[in-house]
């Protein structure tokens, strides 16, 4: 699905990513871990060009989306993104949040009865997504009335509404109260079971062990280790990874 070749990113004279190479295949669950400031969130934001790479290639569905001549919005439709702070529109209801992108894309150029019919279909699909997370009774409320866990689950199904080829998660549980983390991770596990391709920046080591098929360790803008969860956590090779795990696995 995604082939990253020699990806580089600088902010001014500060090099944040120093030549990242990774292939993400269909159905992969890739968990990205690393210390604060290591470049892991920048790496994720470069994957859908929310941050413009300074160098390298990002081949997504056979197109180099890092090429400035490519219309990135066409490709972003196929790449969901879930943020740490939910990024729901507070002036729109839960249902409107989920319908917004599909209506914008699928109803473009439609008028009258055809548009009405398409909006009806999108509404039904959005309600089915809410039913999946047992939140159909929240369709007409505004995000400010929801708990953090509910907001994040809405944000995840909002990304599903576009039928993406891959979903990127940027620390999806780090802004949540501890008792709400489980409901979000359970939803992510169910997506993994269905074969959704996911790239996840997270501090949830238990989730990485249980759900990932690959874990990568980024530090100082480079991938220092990439392995199966079993190898990664039980037999780490890189000294910096060993040191990192000794601090986070208590």
Name each model-derived stretch.
Residues 1-229:
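ABC family nucleotide-binding domain
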Residues 219, 224-226, 230-250:
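C-terminal boundary and immediately downstream tail of ABC-type ATPase nucleotide-binding domains
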């Amino acid at each position: 699905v995604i082939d990253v070749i020699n990806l580089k990113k600088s902010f001014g004279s500060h090099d944040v990513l120093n030549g990242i190479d990774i292939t993400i295949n269909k159905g992969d669950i890739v968990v990205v871990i690393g210390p604060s400031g290591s470049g892991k969130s920048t790496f994720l934001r470069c994957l859908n060009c929310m941050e413009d790479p300074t160098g390298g290639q990002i081949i997504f569905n056979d197109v180099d989306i890092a090429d400035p001549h490519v219309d990135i919005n066409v490709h972003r439709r196929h790449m969901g993104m879930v943020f740490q702070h939910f990024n729901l529109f507070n002036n729109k209801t839960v249902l409107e949040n989920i319908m917004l992108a599909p209506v914008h894309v699928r109803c473009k150029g439609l008028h009258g009865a055809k548009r009405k019919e398409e909006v009806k279909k999108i509404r039904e699909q959005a309600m089915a997504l809410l039913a999946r997370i047992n939140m159909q009774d929240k369709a007409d409320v505004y995000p400010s009335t929801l708990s953090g866990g509910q907001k994040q689950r809405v944000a995840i199904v909002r990304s599903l509404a576009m039928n993406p080829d891959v979903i990127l998660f940027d620390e999806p549980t780090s802004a949540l109260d501890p008792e709400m983390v489980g409901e979000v991770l359970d939803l992510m596990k169910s997506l993994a079971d269905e074969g959704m391709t996911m790239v996840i920046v997270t501090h949830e080591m238990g989730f990485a062990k249980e759900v990932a098929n690959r874990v990568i360790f980024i530090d100082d803008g480079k991938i220092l280790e990439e392995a199966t969860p079993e190898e990664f956590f039980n037999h780490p090779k890189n000294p910096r990874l060993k040191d990192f795990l000794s601090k986070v696995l208590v």
